[in-house]
Amino acid sequence: AARNNDIDFNQVLANGALPMVATFADNFSKMVVTSNADWDEAHPAGTSLDDVLQVRINSSSDFVHDGYDMGEYKYEFLQNYDYLKTIEKRPSELTAADMKMVYYSLTDFSSQTKSPVIVFTSAPTLEKEHTLTLRWTTVEGDVKTASVTCTPEVDPALQ
């Protein structure tokens, strides 16, 4: 919290009716997503999938740096996630400012989750099952890695 100057809110957020407000402890400067399998002819295993996906993240950075301004409807402001700024970009387009104070939830697995989400803009044509690896580089230069095995699909609304 101190690294982002998030030290002055000092208010009760909820009585259990609101989701827990949490952000990653790290701020990030770079994101790369790769697969262990060939995606298509242009994306062999191990290469960046930057041009076949977008990332949706939510940040509370603006809310904190603007002095925690919630207006007069504080409960609704928090309940509706109005304190979060939504960013949707290709990984290579994300800036360090975009990836500062990234929100996450350990309990929200809905399609409307505010946690980071990868959205595919094209489906793989060679291999169907992929182990995707996300590498997030912190502003200090440390690399955080997570992998998941899945069968990527494109949301029909994007086609």
Description of each model-found segment:
Residues 1-159:
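Non-catalytic macromolecular-recognition regions in eukaryotic signaling proteins
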